[in-house]
Swiss-Prot record:
GO terms for molecular function: 2 iron, 2 sulfur cluster binding; dihydroxy-acid dehydratase activity; magnesium ion binding. HAMAP family: IlvD. The gene is ilvD. Its cofactor is [2Fe-2S] cluster; Mg(2+). This is Dihydroxy-acid dehydratase. The active site is at S515. Its EC number is 4.2.1.9.
Length: 612
């Protein structure tokens, strides 16, 4: 049987000093025989998705202690992408993922913790903690802060979210009063933004990976039912410790659970629910930490065979995450995928022997148990709040309509191909990604004229200044992991195109990335990026670009000879923006850029450079 890792600092005469320090944290004699479990919290008052987490780490800690473990809490940083958006703050968002992963590794390994509970929620925190847990490969359970309730206003016939506020603010025909009404209504409670944006997508994917409990991605942050998830996480992690350290059961380790098949399940779910394109970036990064052979080509293959079974904001204004929960949550989508033969149900989870057993227990179409149905009736209260577990409202009924409801069965899928696609061509030899769930059918094939911008700032200025016309392909380059640095999100450019009435008349191509709130023909992650010599850096104003989503291609309609000549010229000139950018890049960001790979590799560090 493996020894507790913590024995390194708690056992033997020579560890008297370390034990003295442990005692100063409150440990007693009997505690030195128990597993020490790290609780990685991410509380901050900067982020609505994390503002309510302050006491939840201790809630988990007390449950761990009741179950026979010793709990030690620490916090990671957390960046709010929405607040960091539209200025140089966004340069720090993606790099913060690596900082979070490293900080969890540092704390757990420095103190020889035996296991880990990850309390995450928003965009880079869940991926960062996921990368760390797979890197460490000790027992782990994820529990998130939960999604925000959708906003409401008398001026709108549907739920509101952050993107609605951004779009209307850029609409010159909207009155100041209307803009203010949206601003005050779009984000009414604590929690991760209410649509199928990056944060909620990732929290849902942890369910498919088998590392979190049912409901983790969908119970709203304010609902009392979410409290039980935190308590159950505390009990579960102690049980996983017992099975690994006392019984030698390696099947409970995260790399055993998050296998190649589990990653395929997670990506299948992502495609079926039209998740954020950022999830591709994060799953690729996590797979590398898990030492799983999972790449863009695998994602491309899945995207061609998985239908879209769920459609949520920003892909439709009709549904938000709270509606997914009412329809049976992530387990309901997994159940439909399993019945369609698109899921590996033999993979393990932290809460069930197999995913198949979990579906049998939690899928509302399979299990008619009243307790299960009551669980999925947990809904929003419509009361502004920054407190966790502050309400206990329930829907009168579930959404079990698999023909026209929020979640569909295979026969009634929103589309036969899923909500994400990988495109290849001479402008992106290593691939790029598009959220097809947000693309109007009329522009699935689009030939347009390149309009070049050397930064997001320049693109925003150009769009608002009416430089972009119908039929243009807005190209924003040198915004990749290395070139930005930091691979900024392009939510403002896409929102402004939408507000200008160009959402169905233009395309946007970038080596940067997009917010989960993005819709329209928005193609990101172009790889290699411009700063790494990618062909996106060779496009010139007026070039024709052909985008063909059904055939998964994107090409610059320029001869190979012309591209070769342009490349020779650019090699001589250097792969840098043609127009100077007023951008201050700190030493920390320069260090990130030095090691960053392009998006097709997950924008992780280039380990080959470290080996040198």
């Amino acid at each position: 049987m493996p020894d507790y890792r913590s024995k390194t600092s708690t056992f033997g005469r020579n560890m008297a000093g370390a034990r003295a320090l442990w005692r100063a944290t409150g440990m007693k004699d009997e505690d030195f025989k128990k597993p020490i479990i790290a609780v990685a919290n991410s509380f901050t008052q900067f982020v609505p998705g994390h503002v309510h987490l302050k006491d939840l780490g201790q809630l988990v800690a007390r449950e761990i202690e009741k179950a026979g473990g010793v709990a030690k809490e620490f916090d990671t940083i957390a960046v709010d992408d929405g607040i960091a958006m539209g200025h140089d703050g966004m340069l720090y968002s993606l790099p913060s993922r690596e900082i979070i992963a490293d900080s969890v590794e540092y704390m757990v390994n420095a103190h020889c913790a035996d296991a880990l509970v990850c309390i995450s929620n928003c965009d880079k925190i869940t991926p960062g903690m996921l990368m760390a847990s797979l890197r460490l490969n000790i027992p782990v359970v994820f529990v998130s802060g939960g999604p925000m309730e959708a906003g409401k206003t008398k001026l709108s016939q549907h739920g509101l979210d952050l993107v609605d506020a951004m779009v209307i603010a850029a609409d010159s025909s909207a009155s100041d009063e209307k803009v203010e009404a949206y601003e005050r209504s779009a984000c009414p409670t604590c929690g991760s933004c209410s649509g199928m944006f990056t944060a909620n997508s990732m929290n849902c994917l942890t369910e498919a990976l088998g590392l979190s409990l049912p409901g983790n991605g969908t119970i709203v942050a304010t609902h009392a039912d979410r409290r039980e998830l935190f308590l159950q996480a505390g009990r579960t992690i102690v049980d996983l410790c017992r099975r690994y350290y006392q019984e030698g059961d390696e099947s409970v380790l995260p790399r055993a659970i998050a296998s190649r098949a589990a990653f395929e399940n997670a990506m299948t779910l992502d495609i079926a629910m039209g998740g954020s394109t950022n999830t591709i970036l994060h799953l690729l990064a996590a797979a590398q930490e898990a030492e799983v052979d999972f790449d863009l080509h695998a994602i491309d293959a899945l995207s061609r065979q998985v239908p879209q079974l769920c459609k949520v904001a920003p892909n439709t204004p009709k549904y938000h995450i709270e509606d997914v929960h009412r329809a049976g949550g992530i387990v309901a989508i997994l159940g439909e995928l399993a019945r369609a033969g698109l899921l590996n149900t033999e993979v393990a989870t932290v809460h069930s022997k197999t995913l198949g057993e979990a579906i049998e227990k939690w899928d509302v179409r399979v299990n008619r148990d009243q307790a299960v149905h009551t669980f999925f009736k947990a809904g929003p209260a419509g009361i502004p709040s920054q407190e966790a577990f502050s309400q206990s409202e329930r829907w009168d009924s579930l959404d079990l309509d698999r023909a026209e409801g929020c979640i569909r069965d295979l026969e009634h899928a929103f589309s036969t191909e899923g909500g994400l696609a990988v495109l290849y061509g001479n402008i992106a030899l290593d691939g790029c990604v598009v959220k097809t769930a947000g693309v109007d059918e009329s522009i699935l094939v689009f030939e347009g004229t390149a309009k070049i911008f050397e930064s997001q700032d320049a693109a925003v200025k150009g769009i608002l200044g009416d430089e972009v016309k119908p039929g243009d392909v807005v190209v924003i380059r040198y915004e990749g992991p290395k070139g930005g640095p930091g691979m900024q999100e392009m939510l403002y450019p896409t929102s402004y195109l939408k507000s200008k009435g160009l959402g169905k008349q233009c395309a946007l191509l970038t080596d940067g990335r997009f917010s989960g709130g993005t819709s329209g023909l928005s193609i990101g992650h172009a790889s290699p990026e411009a700063a790494a010599g990618g062909a996106i850096g060779l496009v010139e104003d007026g070039d024709k670009i052909l985008i063909d989503i059904p055939n998964r291609s994107i090409n610059l309609l320029v001869s190979d000879e012309e591209l070769k000549a342009r490349r020779l010229h650019q090699d001589h000139k250097g792969w840098k923006p043609a127009a100077p950018r007023a951008r201050k890049v700190s030493t920390a960001l320069k260090a990130y850029a030095l090691l960053a790979t392009s998006a097709d590799k997950g924008a992780v560090r280039n380990k080959a450079l470290l080996d040198e």
